[in-house]
């Protein structure tokens, strides 16, 4: 296992604590984590840390995850952070909307743990 300081840092932004805990359990000990319950906390986490990837819920209190993602992409054009959007809304239109907003990947809830883990791993390795 990599030394703690060398493990990639992932920002998990979801308003539900049990889901944040599940995502950490699914992704495992190979990563470090910073958590946010809403967009404001996610913005603070981005200022204070340098995550290698973001796992982002769509439905958040206040500003939506997709609004945050669109703003993030507009601000960070030179070195974008890979973003995986997770959402219970899974229609083709919902997925297209997330990808159009700047998501690198979309994983529907409930998700297969292997799917989420492989998507995050691939985005960090890219």
Spell out what each predicted region is.
Residues 17-34:
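Two-component/phosphorelay signaling modules centered on CheY-like receiver
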Residues 111-120:
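C-terminal output helix
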Residues 61, 91, 110:
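The feature encodes the CheY-like receiver
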Residues 35-53:
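Acidic, metal-coordinating helix/loop segments flanking the phosphotransfer/catalytic sites
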Residues 67, 90-107, 118:
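Alpha4 helix (beta4-alpha4-beta5 surface) of REC/receiver domains from two-component response regulators
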């Amino acid at each position: 296992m990599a030394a703690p300081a060398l493990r990639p840092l992932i920002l998990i932004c979801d308003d539900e604590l049990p889901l944040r805990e599940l995502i950490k359990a699914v992704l495992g000990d190979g990563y470090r984590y910073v958590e946010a319950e809403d967009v404001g906390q996610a913005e603070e986490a981005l200022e204070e840390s340098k995550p290698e990837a973001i796992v982002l819920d769509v439905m958040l209190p206040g500003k939506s995850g997709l609004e945050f993602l669109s703003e993030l992409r507009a601000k960070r054009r030179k070195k974008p952070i890979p973003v995986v959007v997770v959402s219970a809304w899974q229609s083709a239109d919902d997925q297209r909307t997330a990808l159009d907003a700047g998501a690198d990947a979309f994983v529907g809830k409930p998700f297969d743990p292997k799917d989420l883990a492989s998507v995050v791993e691939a985005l960090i390795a890219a």
